[in-house]
């Protein structure tokens, strides 16, 4: 007695990748390879705050505080100016699972790179706006206030850019600050999740 032969319900086929799935970008940390859009990570708000987006869930590990510190450090703003939006499927980048103590390593390195590139772009805009006598990298930034130390002229992130979109990819060509230049990272901060 043989077994009855059934027609398969599903058939496996090789489907082409979805057209909106970006190819990974080499040289970028973790999740930035799949989501290299700067606007997916950082927003300069007109109300003089900065929104940072993460795809990691706050489950007591302090990820909101850590990414806020990293962003504030790279952008040279007070920690109190940073707003963290975590795991909003409409807004946040898809960073996969929150597990294995990898949130700061993955999301943190991505936010750090995104913030460094946002700062670089803002300093280039300020250099033009101020008709600065120094290079963009020599402009001083303190809590979002940008100063050309040679002329004394000033502007801020919010005057330059508040409410706008970057409309550019993260390239990986901008280097974040050296660790010995950090003032916020590695220091105690009030937890944002408590």
Each predicted region: which residue ranges?
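Cofactor-binding beta-sheet edge motifs in enzyme active sites
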Residues: 1-194
